[in-house]
Amino acid sequence: PITQGNRNPLLYKNIGADGIKTGYLAVERYSLASSIERKGRRLIAVGSGFETKSSRSRESTKLLTYGLTNYDLVEVNRSDKAIDKVNVWLGKEKNVNVYVNEDIYKTIKKAKKKLLKVTVKYDGPVEAPIKKDQKIATLRVVYDQELVGEYDLLSSKEIKKVNFLTRLIKSINYLIW
């Protein structure tokens, strides 16, 4: 059998790199797609046009180190966590918890963490009846004044409508007050 070592130089440095691919073309020169994983976060760096193998290794290491040093993976919300309560009109309950059905993470600059804003948008109160998992609001994620994500907010449970007499009283109350 023929044994051939891996040509990715980052695998042999003590930085934790675990892949991906080296290359060489006469036109593009040396290239490297590299990958590293730390604390559940994976960074991938791709570079080409390097004149030498050593510059390919050095610049790829710099790029991965820059990413690890200057960026964080921030948990915006977990799918099993209620985000907010939304007011319910004419329901047997006054409000309902809302949640997102997926975990939300964003990669942001460490120095700008305070620029990450999360808001709930809905036209409320929401009128009953409400079904479980019905979309009733939107979660907006803004980073550095740019919208980076919108997610459906779903009701955590079913809310039934109050009976006719209660609806009538609440409606009259609303009109008077």
Predicted regions and their residues:
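Domain-terminus/edge residues, biased toward the C-terminal soluble/receptor-binding domains
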Residues: P1-W177
